């Protein structure tokens, strides 16, 4: 009796301190039970250790301490025949600890035991819900280790458990997760398409009131549809989902702001009502207002948000209020795909990816700034400041750091591509140097970014007229990825740079690169690579004077660029080549029309090199037609644009970063010392390579959603075949 009274008293005191936000004192009350000389019942100690571990995971970085409490609690529970919910909670929390510590084999073994227990108890709703929880976590461990078949099997088991209890939100959670795995492994188009159709079918069965309880499920489903469309380079159909995401994110943000204002007012009212000397009439009015505010908060809030779940945040242990979360599913999963801030940034990124090829540079620049600011704020919360390197990271922060660092690289990649498109080479330099510096500080976490950095160095080098260096960096990029599609793109870009040099040796190298690519377009995962290969091959055929075949190839590439990709810059470049071809075939009427369209697009994009390219062909056209007045007017405009380009190039070449970016050398990395912390970092980060929840289709290791690498400029396809324009 004495022990029970002491425990009740300490639990009550812990409740009091927790309501006041005094987490340290709350933990001390619970630790007093665990360390007391008084003999408590096993259940008392178990409940105390469970609650203590949950607090440590949520409010501190002491994962090992939490793990010790949970392991002790699990031992105590073995002597208790029932108490299944406590056992399930213990298994789930301990699994989270192993996940945060990157102890994946122990986590997998623990989850298998938890599933065995869940299948052996009476099969009520609680047992099925916990089966969903454990299958979800088990699938995640398999994904981290790139065991996609086992992950799909675990997710299918979770789906069946959700189906047994007719829980459509959970069914959708597992269906979307299976689509996610299919997108990551992408064995064939048919399997992924079937997974997409299954998601659409399940989504139709969920009523709107249920989706409101799990707002993250909508974002997860829509984002996966965007990834799927981008992977197919189906940018036009991806746009519909991007628009839905953007509208939903704005609506959700406004809703959360309203709720936060209500909560702030409610907190102020509660403080006023706590005064003992408050007049009764005023107290009555404040109480009525309090009731109104609480009803409004309840109406706006997801039903699961008001429940204090024992589960910690699914990713990491950063304490965040429920208004900052986008829950994927109901309790006891309550998981997030990514934190709300990461989803916010990702939506901005999708808007950039869909808008940049269309030349919507003002909106894209604004979104890039917003996304980078969100990421910078989160990196600071994770302790990543200017001097921090990956070896300095807390182990529990590695996963979440990688999410935001990878997102940051995606934004910087798009900034480089955007600035190169509109001929702002100094801005492109700065963004590319930022990418390089982040990579040298976090080489293991950002290992997948090295290929794209080399590719962008090649694009920058080509843009400023360093064609040999451009080819070098594109060839180096092929060595840094196992993606056949990415390798094909890099080789195509290198071939264009070689063709721009124009001498016999370089043309031979271009032929060696393009020849093997020509026969493999059907084996590539997207039309983006095919468009790049067709451009390079068409250019080669033009240099070989096989004009009719060149026209056929370029016409096919133009159709892809226009119908599937919607990339105005690539369309302008294709049109320029086709206009020049028409001129070479003495079809001056068609040449004039094609070149006018190309020049219009190049002007819209502020793409000065392409404008100059078109203007030089116009000069040849007017000379052929004997239109002296048009020729002089055209030359005057061309000279103006030439001077503008030379000014920009001089500024870029005069930058302190120019030499290091074009130099024929890979990025030098600092050496990792052989200490346990850094070895652990390498092991855990390598286990996650390629498995960030942003699939390849966004642009790191696989088909980039918008061809930042279509910077195919500096080519003179007029009379002086193969000569440099600069």
UniProtKB/Swiss-Prot annotation:
Q: Which SUPFAM superfamilies match?
A: TPR-like
Q: Give the start-end ranges of region Disordered.
A: 697-726
How does inactivating the gene affect the organism?
Answer: Defective embryo arrested at preglobular/early globular stage. Suspensor overproliferation phenotype preceded by ectopic auxin maxima distribution. Reduced efficacy of cohesin immobilization in nuclei.
Which tissues express it?
Expressed ubiquitously.
Cross-referenced Pfam families, in alphabetical order? Cohesin_load (PF10345)
Q: Mostly located where?
A: nucleus
Q: Where in the cell is it found?
A: Nucleus; Cytoplasm
One GO cellular component term of this record is: nucleus
Tell me one GO biological process term.
chromosome segregation
- Leader sequence segment: none
Enumerate the UniProt keywords alphabetically: Cell cycle, Cell division, Chromosome partition, Cytoplasm, Mitosis, Nucleus, Repeat, TPR repeat
- Superkingdom of this entry's organism? Eukaryota
Xref: PANTHER family: MAU2 CHROMATID COHESION FACTOR HOMOLOG
Summarizing the function annotation, the protein's role is:
Essential protein required for cell fate determination during embryogenesis. Involved in sister chromatid cohesion. Forms a complex with SCC2, which is required for the association of the cohesin complex with chromosomes.
Subunit structure, per the record?
Interacts with SCC2 to form the cohesin loading complex.
Q: What is this protein called?
A: Sister chromatid cohesion protein SCC4
Q: Which organism is it from?
A: Arabidopsis thaliana (Mouse-ear cress)
